[in-house]
Amino acid sequence: MRKILLTACLIACSLIAEAKDWTQYVNPLMGTQSSFELSTGNTYPAIARPWGMNFWTPQTGKMGDGWQYTYTANKIRGFKQTHQPSPWINDYGQFSIMPVTGKLEFDEEKRASWFSHKGEIATPSYYKVYLAEHDVVTEMTPTERAVLFRFTFPENEHSYIVVDAFDKGSYVKVIPEENKIIGYTTRNSGGVPENFKNYFVIEFDKPFTYKGTFADKKLEEGNLEQKADHTGAIIGFSTRKGEIVHARIASSFISFEQAAQNLKELGNDSFEQLAQKGNDAWNKVLGKIEVEGGNLDQYRTFYS
């Protein structure tokens, strides 16, 4: 009888340990109140799967700034795919996506939106923020090589999504019949091959009523393809209040075809299913170490 009770207790304890949500202790914003002059961590909110090829982060810094997200900033310029190990080494293969409403603005300064940390949620594999100036809620949850964005728009006849391929050599192409944008960025900070490119594929679940591209700060409505130092693409549509638009994004250092292959990682899962799978993946890694004693702040420091 004692053996049966002991076995039952061990199984129950095991189930409790397995079910524990270790991600509740992780704060991706920890260490982001840093600058060139003073570091409190020199980190950024790296939203990713464990050991993912790509990280995604809200971008408050200017294009090329190693401090791509700082806690004291109050405007977001975009949501960036990043591979940056530290602000001193900087980034490579980066590009961004940003929802805009009302007047069409694609310049990173003019499209930027005020935000508050009160309207921001950051976990290891999920990020959400309210962009006040555009009245858009942006959410993202990644896999190893892909990411699913969920934009909740207001009622507006002029809702847009800007894809910024950044400077130092880039290319974009809008494919309306497939609700798709493809492109590549060559931006880097050294340490890459001469023919380096990060190819990306973006698929939307809403047809475009507006199509345009920009090159070196010049907007060209109706032009579906650009290759220049700094390029980007813009698609638009009218939206109802609370209408959700999804963007499925994947990239590859090999080719457009490989980027499309990587996009299959998202499968047919819903946004919630992908977010849960990301949370489960992090719990599997974080749960390998269980600490005893200490207070909540110490737990947060350890697991972050």
Predicted regions and their residues:
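Positively charged n-region of N-terminal signal peptides that target proteins for export
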Residues: M1-I4
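Hydrophobic h-region of N-terminal signal peptides that target proteins for export
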Residues: C9-E18
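Accessory carbohydrate-recognition regions in carbohydrate-active enzymes
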Residues: K20-S304
